[in-house]
C-alpha cells in the first residue's frame, strides 16, 4: 500500500557501527533502526545497513514504509492490557487515564508517540536490545483488539 510520506514523522532509534577487521585494516559499516508514524494509528519500523550513515537511514526509512501496521486506539490510549515477548525482550502495555502521558522508556517511547497514543503505562522486561524492544512493541500494538 502506498502512503503519503509527508504525513509521516521519522525517529532514528539506533545507529550502530559494525567493524570487520581485514588484512588492510578495519572496514566500518553502519546499521540504522528507524520508526515512522503519522500519529493517527499508523506506525512501522525499518532496519537499514550501509557503508555510510545517511544511506543506512534512507534504507531503514524505505523498509519502515513496507512494514506499516494500523493500530486500533481507544481515544488517547489502548483498549486493554497486553504482554508480549519477542526473543529475550518482554513488553507490558497498560491503558492509562487521560492526562497520564506516555510513561515509557528507551525504544518503546518513539513507537507509542508516533502511533498517536498520549496516555499509557509501559514496562520493558528482559533484554533491552533496541531492535527487539521495537519489534515487541509493534507486535503488541498489532495484537490489540478494540
Curated annotation (Swiss-Prot):
GO BP annotations, alphabetical order: translation
Domain of life: Bacteria
InterPro entries with a match to the protein in the record: Ribosomal_Su5_D2-typ_SF (IPR020568), Ribosomal_uS5 (IPR000851), Ribosomal_uS5_bac-type (IPR005712), Ribosomal_uS5_C (IPR005324), Ribosomal_uS5_N (IPR013810), Ribosomal_uS5_N_CS (IPR018192), Ribsml_uS5_D2-typ_fold_subgr (IPR014721)
GO MF annotations, alphabetized: rRNA binding; structural constituent of ribosome
Keyword Ribosomal protein carried by entry: yes
Domain S5 DRBM as annotated: residue spans: 8-71
Pfam families in UniProt: Ribosomal_S5, Ribosomal_S5_C
Gene3D superfamilies: 3.30.160.20, 3.30.230.10
Disulfide bridge positions per record: none
TM spans (from-to): none
GO cellular component: small ribosomal subunit
Record has Membrane as a keyword: no
Keywords: Ribonucleoprotein, Ribosomal protein, RNA-binding, rRNA-binding
Subunit and interaction comment: Part of the 30S ribosomal subunit. Contacts proteins S4 and S8.
Role description: With S4 and S12 plays an important role in translational accuracy.
Entry similarity comment: Belongs to the universal ribosomal protein uS5 family.
Domain notes: The N-terminal domain interacts with the head of the 30S subunit; the C-terminal domain interacts with the body and contacts protein S4. The interaction surface between S4 and S5 is involved in control of translational fidelity.
Name by which UniProt lists this protein: Small ribosomal subunit protein uS5
Lineage: Bacteria, Pseudomonadati, Campylobacterota, Epsilonproteobacteria, Campylobacterales
